[in-house]
Amino acid sequence: MAAAAVVVPAEWIKNWEKSGRGEFLHLCRILSENKSHDSSTYRDFQQALYELSYHVIKGNLKHEQASNVLSDISEFREDMPSILADVFCILDIETNCLEEKSKRDYFTQLVLACLYLVSDTVLKERLDPETLESLGLIKQSQQFNQKSVKIKTKLFYKQQKFNLLREENEGYAKLIAELGQDLSGSITSDLILENIKSLIGCFNLDPNRVLDVILEVFECRPEHDDFFISLLESYMSMCEPQTLCHILGFKFKFYQEPNGETPSSLYRVAAVLLQFNLIDLDDLYVHLLPADNCIMDEHKREIAEAKQIVRKLTMVVLSSEKMDEREKEKEKEEEKVEKPPDNQKLGLLEALLKIGDWQHAQNIMDQMPPYYAASHKLIALAICKLIHITIEPLYRRVGVPKGAKGSPVNALQNKRAPKQAESFEDLRRDVFNMFCYLGPHLSHDPILFAKVVRIGKSFMKEFQSDGSKQEDKEKTEVILSCLLSITDQVLLPSLSLMDCNACMSEELWGMFKTFPYQHRYRLYGQWKNETYNSHPLLVKVKAQTIDRAKYIMKRLTKENVKPSGRQIGKLSHSNPTILFDYILSQIQKYDNLITPVVDSLKYLTSLNYDVLAYCIIEALANPEKERMKHDDTTISSWLQSLASFCGAVFRKYPIDLAGLLQYVANQLKAGKSFDLLILKEVVQKMAGIEITEEMTMEQLEAMTGGEQLKAEGGYFGQIRNTKKSSQRLKDALLDHDLALPLCLLMAQQRNGVIFQEGGEKHLKLVGKLYDQCHDTLVQFGGFLASNLSTEDYIKRVPSIDVLCNEFHTPHDAAFFLSRPMYAHHISSKYDELKKSEKGSKQQHKVHKYITSCEMVMAPVHEAVVSLHVSKVWDDISPQFYATFWSLTMYDLAVPHTSYEREVNKLKVQMKAIDDNQEMPPNKKKKEKERCTALQDKLLEEEKKQMEHVQRVLQRLKLEKDNWLLAKSTKNETITKFLQLCIFPRCIFSAIDAVYCARFVELVHQQKTPNFSTLLCYDRVFSDIIYTVASCTENEASRYGRFLCCMLETVTRWHSDRATYEKECGNYPGFLTILRATGFDGGNKADQLDYENFRHVVHKWHYKLTKASVHCLETGEYTHIRNILIVLTKILPWYPKVLNLGQALERRVHKICQEEKEKRPDLYALAMGYSGQLKSRKSYMIPENEFHHKDPPPRNAVASVQNGPGGGPSSSSIGSASKSDESSTEETDKSRERSQCGVKAVNKASSTTPKGNSSNGNSGSNSNKAVKENDKEKGKEKEKEKKEKTPATTPEARVLGKDGKEKPKEERPNKDEKARETKERTPKSDKEKEKFKKEEKAKDEKFKTTVPNAESKSTQEREREKEPSRERDIAKEMKSKENVKGGEKTPVSGSLKSPVPRSDIPEPEREQKRRKIDTHPSPSHSSTVKDSLIELKESSAKLYINHTPPPLSKSKEREMDKKDLDKSRERSREREKKDEKDRKERKRDHSNNDREVPPDLTKRRKEENGTMGVSKHKSESPCESPYPNEKDKEKNKSKSSGKEKGSDSFKSEKMDKISSGGKKESRHDKEKIEKKEKRDSSGGKEEKKHHKSSDKHR
């Protein structure tokens, strides 16, 4: 009773008399306002009466009070007695169940009190007989029950008896005659009905049987629908409504026998009766078979069978078994066709559809599984017929093609049929709905298919052109969504079930091409991935398509492309998605299928090509496929195959590219660059723009010409017939605004690759992705530049500052995109000016061109200022920067040889055409005309380019004075030029690499003020390690091309004095005194002469060798790969020097051996380079032929420029450093180890060690010394004339016999001194005597060779300087090691000479040694500092490492082995003693320095100086790059501890470090000392120079 309290609260009952009664009456009045029985107020009213009565039963209220209030309420509602009787009925049941007798009594009292409100009849209907008896309404309940049963039996079960034998036959005969009469006259249904009534009454006919006869006659006379319908309506008004339905049901039941067939006339009668609502569908439906659950089971069985077929088709079965199974399947299907089950529900449905009763037909189909009804052909055709009728007026108006008559469809006469569609809006009413029920079974009616598609096409035209109101737009959008749904659910599935109908496919494309690609691809996606699973028939079709596709693909080859192509075309018309999905899966596995597949696709329809584009994108976007191979260093082959297929298929066939391009753009947005491979292939194939690093120099040269030359000579394959395909690509890009976004995304992604994609990926793969991104950008940008019109290009590409600052495009890419725009602008302005003033003079034309350049480039000059900090513009002007980035190779030079080559090819071609007798005359004429036209085009293009280049050069001549501002040093200017211009652009593309080299040459040729060509070239060649190491594979290739072009220029100047004098002699770029004041004029003395230039070129070659060897020995994949690529590119011009070439050859050979198993790609590169290097060996020359090496005059101040140790600071040649450059030199000292530029330090090239000052500067020598040395200088010159001594250089001199380095002493001063003293420490009395004699002989030698020119005070000063300088060098060396951070630094100073000793016969060697002895150490024309270092080093070696005379190798080995054993024993025994001796010697040595005579002081000082220099040299930037040796030496010295000083350890170390070189030991030295004793002092000198002379060889 929780709910009762809500309606009648207990408070009302408690205060009934006061307020409760009034409240209750008020409530009932409100609830009685709504008289409806369905409303909630009616239920609340019932509840209120129930609660009131319940309170009486509980005893809370008296029955009199309740009856009084109920009598008042009875006025509110007429149905009060009925409601009250219902309440009493419920209470009667409830109180009967209760055990409490009091409540039952209260209930009886209440009913009795209310008898005047409810009639007896109503109570007798509602209450139990027992209750009625207790109320006194009936006498006995039992009698009452019996009477009730009798009455019901009489009413419902007793039948009226008729006399069937006598009267009835005549009555029925008369009835049939009445119904069968001619109804065309004035006879009406009412008149007939009166006659029927008379017959029933007269003959006592059964009304049900009469009704049955009427239905039978109706079946036979369907043309009189209206008459019979009105007759039945009138007749049924006298019968029970259900009677008609039961009779019809009985008729249907009669035909439900096993072989029974329901007549169509019965279906039609039932349908008409349903349409006019004479019967109810629900009532009739239960009489029809089969039952709904049987239909559902049948549907499930069909799906299971379809899946079973799929499984069988996908199983691998032998062909014979397969054929047997197929035959059995066919037999089963035939059996099924013979015995179709009779489905009465479908029969009725067909009849309904035929008469146009869509509503009832829809209700029946809703009871069945989706498309179950339509899967029966008759039903499908009936729906199609109804749709034909409904869309007829609209189709006649908008769908009939021009010139077509068509066959009009007659409308249904039935007024209740669906209304015909007059407009697109009317289609929403019924037509779209009908199509949804039809589904894929529209395939039964291709004509209706075509009609719908044509209506859809007309709607899309109207939709796209419509500029109507907002309301209309909303309506049309609803129709569009309905049309898309119909396409998805009906048109495409129906196409799948049609038997390869190409016409339907083309018709459908007529509508599809009006959709945007997003709609189309969504539809294809649904079709491919969902539609085929929605219906059993489609499941079978999919399996059969795949089976057939497999059959075709297995047999597809290049030879049978045509027949296979036809089969593919036939299969694709109906099921393209399934077919292409399978074909693409095969292409991804077998890339050799690409060409035959592409050729076989020529029989497709337009729709199929579009579906193919979608399938390609879906295959590319497959998330389950890995885009990298398992090694994580290369892109997967499936992706490469798909990319290749894309390029080929999009080029050959007219396929819409928008979707593919948008997909690539979306991938780039998401930071994924793998799919750029697709774009690269598409642009390459469609536009003919090839991007490859393997271009020959001829191709590269052709690429610097005009468009015609590029097409003819710039690519590997002849690019033909790309006009249409490139136009399609351009249109796709412009129509969807993808041109600039793709460029910007690629430019941004290029740098993003490293950070977004480079995290966990292999460095090799990151490099490949970077290259792919960059190459595609270059290729794509090239396509846009050559294919977009000027207006299109300018409209889309923003200004340079916007590109860089707003879009964050890297500067090189931004200028690359803007460059064509500047060229277009300038040419259009120039044309305007030419037209405005028609002056034919060349000067006028040039002036106009320069004016147009200024107009176009002025805003660019302003824009570029924002790209860099203001400090940059102190070194180079914005004008120079913009000029460099805006020009191309086309602007700088005309490739005459390339034009000539192509013209000659055409001439040869024409001659071949003339000679060909088999060619038909017409074709001959055509081909010759083509060749002639092409030739004329090329010649015209060459002429045009020549004029253009002349104009550009004139412009540059005028601009050059404002290019370099000279606000800071030339060194800074060159740094900025290289950093902001040359290096970013030289690795951008192969043509840009050539451009950079040619631009540097052009700036030099223009005699540009403040530009040091020498410094620029020196900075480029001096240290390439860091640049090479930071390149990707393709960048390394381009950098190699750049170096190659730079070397080509340098080699041209180097090879001929006249060329050098002509092109460099008086040019400011070759000034050797570099000032920051802008003064470039100068004395002839300031210019670098030809011989010194050759020395500088040798230095550059040496630097390249050093860097190459360093990279090769790092073991790093990138270093090795890149340097091999660079070396391969510069092979035409480097190496030219024999010993450098041999050193490289050995290192590369080592790489070949090491990498053969580990890294096959490096092995292949190394082998390739090694082979090419060997073939170039015959062109290499000895070093003395490469640069002339005169021995320097003694004690003269030598003018030498830029040795291998030079740094990047400004320098002078032949004079002292200028004061205004000294500050620059100081600031650049930190760069001296990492960078090699042009640096000149004036030093004295003294012939004696004594003549060298400790800091390497000639300034410390006194004037006296110079004068005294002049005398010897004269003698030297006389000797020079007599004996043309072969000159040596520091680089070559430090090359050993077999290219392995000799160890250089790199210990701290203490160790070196200890070793010196130790060597002088005798082991026996004999040794002591030998040692003293040797010392004496050396003193004599030094006295003869060194004039005592310097005062004692100078000597003392030098003695004080020397140890401190050594300490500084030691510190410097340590700090350098720390900076390198574990990088292995070389031990020896340079490479060894590869010339073996045995090549020169003994007497000749002796003779050469004597010649060399007469000139103590020849000077190299590189830096004086380097010369001094070399002199000191050689003198140190003379003292420390005495070389024994040539011995046989076997003897040497024996002696070494014995000596090694002895020395090891001695070293163990005297280990402690040595330590003590070392300390004593150190003390003695310091005392001796104070006490020894001047001669000995000179010698010792020389030794110390040499060692210091030796150490200093090993850490200079020009050291030989053998990284492992130093670390080995260091480790050994640590492990040995106190054995360092012993000769045995030294000899052991020598043994390991210099493989193939002569090993030295104490035993050897003793022999040398004995021999030296016998020889004269000249002889001693001869031996001392033995080692260095060998190195020259």
UniProtKB/Swiss-Prot annotation:
Q: Which InterPro entries match?
A: Tho2, THO_THOC2_C, THO_THOC2_N, THOC2_N
What mutagenesis or variant effect is reported for C981Y? In MRXSK; uncertain significance
- Kindly name one Pfam family recorded for this protein: Thoc2
Q: Where is this region: Anchor domain?
A: 1-163
- Which ranges are annotated Polar residues under compositional bias? 1416-1425
Quick one: effect of changing L438P?
In MRXSK; uncertain significance; reduced amounts of protein; reduced amounts of other THO complex subunits; the mutant protein has a significantly shorter half-life
Q: What is the effect of changing L313F?
A: In MRXSK; uncertain significance
Q: Where is this region: Stern domain?
A: 687-1174
Q: What is the effect of changing I800T?
A: In MRXSK; uncertain significance; reduced amounts of mutant protein; reduced amounts of other THO complex subunits; the mutant protein has a significantly shorter half-life
Sites of the modification Phosphoserine?
S1222, S1390, S1393, S1417, S1450, S1486, S1516
Q: Where in the cell is it found?
A: Nucleus; Nucleus speckle; Cytoplasm
Effect noted on mutating W1100C: In MRXSK; uncertain significance
Tell me the outcome of changing G713D. In MRXSK; uncertain significance; decreased protein abundance; does not affect nuclear and cytoplasmic localization
Noted disease association is: Intellectual developmental disorder, X-linked, syndromic, Kumar type: A form of intellectual disability, a disorder characterized by significantly below average general intellectual functioning associated with impairments in adaptive behavior and manifested during the developmental period. Intellectual deficiency is the only primary symptom of non-syndromic X-linked forms, while syndromic forms present with associated physical, neurological and/or psychiatric manifestations. MRXSK patients manifest variable degrees of intellectual disability.
Question: What's the protein here called?
Answer: THO complex subunit 2
Origin species: Homo sapiens
Its organism's taxonomic lineage begins at: Eukaryota, Metazoa, Chordata, Craniata, Vertebrata
Q: Which gene encodes it?
A: THOC2
